[in-house]
């Protein structure tokens, strides 16, 4: 049937989408000297398909690094939320959950653990924030980190 997508296919679809995004959107913008913000990147696949779907984090990382020709972010912002709190937040509105969002809390706990492990392995690249903080506080902390990163980049190119 057309309803179920197996884990490998899902991983490859996300990697293909990321390949197109990197070559058609990210690289051209970076070549123009623009600052690029993007929602979800390689580490999302590592967490969701590698850990969540049990395909192996290194396998999924390798596929995605190849797909994006090694393009890496300067900063990854992780808004951390407990799986049960995340479900409550998602179902509080009228939005219906997608295929990944509707997975069991155990699946989301594996993903959260994978993201926190990635952040612990690369603290210089990650900004981990508690998602329950007020939006203004989250925005302020993110802007502070981005401003520091841009200032560092300007001083190194001067």
Positions of predicted regions on the chain:
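ATP-dependent small-molecule kinase phosphotransfer cores
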Residues: 1-68
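Hydrophobic/aromatic beta-strand patches that form the interior of the parallel beta-sheet core
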Residues: 37, 75-77, 127-129
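NTP-dependent small-molecule kinase module
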Residues: 84-158
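Short, solvent-exposed coil/turn segments
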Residues: 7-9, 72, 122
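Short beta->alpha linker loops
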Residues: 17, 41, 81-82, 130-134
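A glycine- and Lys/Arg-enriched "phosphate-lid" helix/loop adjacent to the NTP-binding pocket
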Residues: 44-113
């Amino acid at each position: 049937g057309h309803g179920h997508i197996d884990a490998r296919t899902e991983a490859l679809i996300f990697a293909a989408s990321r390949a197109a995004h990197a070559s058609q959107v990210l690289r051209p913008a970076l070549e123009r000297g623009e600052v690029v913000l993007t929602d979800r990147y390689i580490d999302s696949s590592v967490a969701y398909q590698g850990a969540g779907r049990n395909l192996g984090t290194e396998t999924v990382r390798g596929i995605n690094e190849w797909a994006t020709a090694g393009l890496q972010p300067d900063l990854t912002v992780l808004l951390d939320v407990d799986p049960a709190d995340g479900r409550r937040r998602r179902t509080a509105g009228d939005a219906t959950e997608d295929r990944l969002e509707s997975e069991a809390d155990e699946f989301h706990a594996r993903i959260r653990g994978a993201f926190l492990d990635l952040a612990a392995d690369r603290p210089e690249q990650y900004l981990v924030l508690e998602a329950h903080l007020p939006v203004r506080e989250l925005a302020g902390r993110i802007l502070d980190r981005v401003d520091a990163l841009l200032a560092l980049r300007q001083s190194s190119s001067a």
